[in-house]
Regions:
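Amphipathic alpha-helical "coupling" segments that flank catalytic cores
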Residues: 1-702
């Protein structure tokens, strides 16, 4: 089959960095879906882009569609014929396919290859649709225009008198199939082979020869259109500039992503500021450079900041002027930060603790000061339940009292990302215990699902109390997430709480529902009249169970997560134990005996589903039942205290039990209606099924 490369370039006014990143992520799927709908085979799809252009190159695109020959499901026979004659439904179906009625047939729906989702049993009218593949060139113009209009942006705009929308006004279009132009019109612009280079270094229009020369032609025009190449070039120059200063740049993926999406040919200029500003906390200086300026900070081998920064610019012309302006802005921003720092130290925690009373956490849940009071009480309860030592408990309460104070500081008001960090700095300056100061900073951890947890008990206690308070309060007043909307980040808070409970060593024995009930007591005066603590615990538990399922699934597999969650109603109560069971189960899930265990688990629950679980015994001379008794007793003994005996030991024991039970099921009539011992046998097997569930629901391991 003949193939050619395809190029589409959309030139636009400057796109924000987030628009570029989002479009580059979406383009390959958009193109792949459109080509699949057109029955056009293709090779690799490459999304390229800068602030001034979005492009896609498709390798090895077929020049001709594949032929179509498919079976098409029509209306049910009962709707297609009446009194042996075709109805309008049958005629419409034939017209849709473009075939005469006598070329349609009636078949059993179960034998069809083109079944519909949720198709009901019965006989259906079917036909075949055939179509010769057409030339790709005749189809691509419209398809590419549709792709242009489907690119998602956080905010799209219209301009002029047109109806098309895009992230920014479109300036030019290039569409080439091989070396030949594709006729494409989008947003009132007709495509050609004329592209544009760097706005300042190569502003003249030039012709693109083909998709295969596109990247190199733009490179010569001072545009690195491949984002990966642009990023590597940029960071190579950043690294070289930092080394020239005798240091290294402070790693920051946000700055890498942001600057790579803000430039077409990135260059680095080195700026500096007064060394006196280095008296400010390291995090403040980095925040100033990082925030509006998007500069990289530089540090020496001892991780001490140097009085320099590295700015990414889109042109290397006249660097002295660029540095002069950048230095002036950096100095002004650092001067403001120094003023905030000195003023904050004058007033300190007593004043902030009063001011947070004027900051609303949520109109239905009170102020931040009220939230802090709840965190303090809940921290005391967690410290008690976790049985930490007296010093840790004392420091946890002290940290809880101060954990949100810096929200009222001038510095955090200007740099919200420094919440907690400034609290630590001010606490140390005020002579607070280092453990308390660190907890003020670390109680915000983990921020994301994969971020580090607080390392010490003090911070972990306050972090858990904060998350549980937020979860309980929002659910108690009816602010649970709906669909994809989660304005109060309850999913993130829940995941953080579950990770703390499952990964922090002193929290393994804490029960999730106990914490929710302890937190709920502080909201009784705010809760809706028709909501009690049991309803709140139930709603939060259902919500948290799904989050726990996801956490377990990420570490093991979806099947293992389903098996562990379904196996025990208490999985959520002690997430650490659930995680341990899942990890042990994952180690053996691929072994041959697991399939036997899955089948046995399913049959056990099937034959005994209506029987009450009872650990019966039988006469020793009753060979059939005594064998079952022995196996169930083995199951019971190996799973009764899994924390002591170990899950892996129980699984090792269960391997033999599963095989023997499988044999018994194959050789014995378990539910014998003529055997007077059948009811007791079923109750015993029901008990065996409950023993299996102590580990997991093996029937879920499909």
């Amino acid at each position: 089959m003949s193939t050619l490369p395809l190029l589409l370039e959309i030139g636009a006014e400057e796109l924000p960095s987030s628009f570029v990143d989002g479009a580059l992520a979406a383009l390959p799927k958009l193109v792949e879906g459109k080509l699949a709908a057109l029955r056009l085979s293709h090779g690799a799809i490459h999304a390229l882009g800068t602030p001034r252009r979005l492009a896609v190159i498709v390798e090895g695109l077929a020049t001709t569609q594949s032929d179509l020959d498919e079976e098409v499901l029509g209306p049910p026979e009962t709707a297609a014929f009446k009194d042996g004659k075709p109805t309008k439904a049958a005629e419409a179906f034939a017209a849709k396919l473009g075939v005469p009625l006598d070329q349609l047939s009636v078949v059993d729906g179960d034998t069809m290859t083109s079944k519909k989702p949720n198709q009901k049993p019965g006989r259906y009218l079917v036909g075949r649709r055939s179509e010769k593949g057409g030339a790709a060139r005749e189809l691509l113009g419209r398809a590419l225009a549709e792709i242009c209009g489907a690119i998602p942006f956080r905010k799209s705009m219209r301009w002029g008198t047109g109806e098309a929308t895009f992230g920014r006004p479109v300036q030019w279009l290039v569409a080439l199939f091989g070396k030949d132009p594709i006729d494409l019109i989008f947003a009132g612009i007709r495509s050609a082979r004329l592209s544009r280079g760097h706005r300042f270094l190569a502003p003249a229009q030039f012709e693109i020869e083909s998709a295969t020369t596109y990247v190199e032609q733009l490179r010569k025009a001072h545009v690195l259109v491949d984002r990966k190449e642009r990023e590597e070039t940029m960071m190579g120059r950043v690294d070289a500039a930092a080394k020239a200063l005798g240091g290294s740049f402070v790693p920051d993926q946000y700055l890498v992503d942001e600057n790579a999406s803000l430039t077409e040919e990135p260059h680095v200029v080195t700026g500096s500021f007064d060394r006196a500003f280095l008296e400010l906390p390291r995090e403040v200086i980095i925040a100033v450079a990082r925030g509006h300026q998007k500069y990289f900070s530089v540090e020496d081998a001892q991780k001490n900041l140097l009085p320099n920064y590295l700015a990414i610019v889109n042109t290397a012309s006249n660097p002295a002027n660029i540095v002069k302006g950048n230095d002036r802005v950096m100095t002004a921003r650092l001067s403001d930060a120094r003023f905030f720092f000195e003023e904050d130290k004058k007033h300190g925690f007593p004043r902030w603790n009063e001011k947070i009373g004027t900051i609303v956490f949520h109109v239905r849940l009170g102020s931040v000061k009220e939230k802090v009071a709840r965190i303090v009480k809940l921290s005391a309860e967690i410290a008690k339940l976790a049985k930490v030592d007296e010093t840790t408990a004392k420091n946890a309460l002290a940290a809880a009292e101060l954990c949100k104070s810096d929200l009222a500081s001038l510095m955090v008001g200007e740099f919200p990302e420094l919440q907690g960090t400034m609290g630590q700095a001010y606490a140390l300056a005020d002579g607070k215990d280092p453990a308390v100061a660190s907890a003020i900073r670390d109680h915000y951890k983990p921020v994301g699902a994969d971020d580090d947890l607080p390392k010490d008990d003090v911070a972990a206690i306050v972090a858990l109390a904060d998350r549980i308070d937020t979860l309980t309060g929002c659910f108690a007043v009816g602010l649970a997430p709906t669909g994809s909307a989660d304005p109060y980040a309850l999913r993130r808070n829940c995941i953080a709480a579950l990770r703390l409970l499952s990964e922090h060593p002193h929290f393994e024995s804490l029960r999730f529902s106990d914490l929710i009930r302890a937190a709920y007591k502080q909201f009784e005066w705010k809760k809706p009249a028709d909501l009690d603590d049991t309803a709140t615990v139930t709603k939060i538990s259902e919500f948290a169970t799904e989050r726990l399922r996801g956490l377990i699934g990420n570490k093991t597999s979806t099947a293992v997560a389903d098996a562990v969650i379904a196996g025990s109603d208490s999985a959520l109560e002690q997430p650490a134990f659930a995680m341990m069971k899942a990890a042990s189960l994952q180690k053996v899930v691929g072994e041959p005996w697991i399939e036997t265990a899955r089948a046995v688990g399913k049959r056990l629950r099937g034959v005994s589903k209506d029987a009450k679980p009872e650990n019966h015994d039988f006469a020793k001379d009753d060979a059939k039942n005594s064998r079952i008794v022995s196996l169930v007793h083995t199951l019971d003994a190996s799973t009764r205290d899994l924390r002591t005996t170990g899950v892996e030991a129980a699984l090792l024991s269960f391997e033999n039990v599963a095989k023997e039970l499988g044999t018994i099921f194959d050789e014995t009539l378990i539910n014998d209606p003529n055997d007077p011992l059948t009811p007791k046998r079923l109750e015993l097997l029901s008990y065996g099924a409950s023993c299996m569930l102590r580990i997991a629901d093996f029937s879920r391991l499909a």
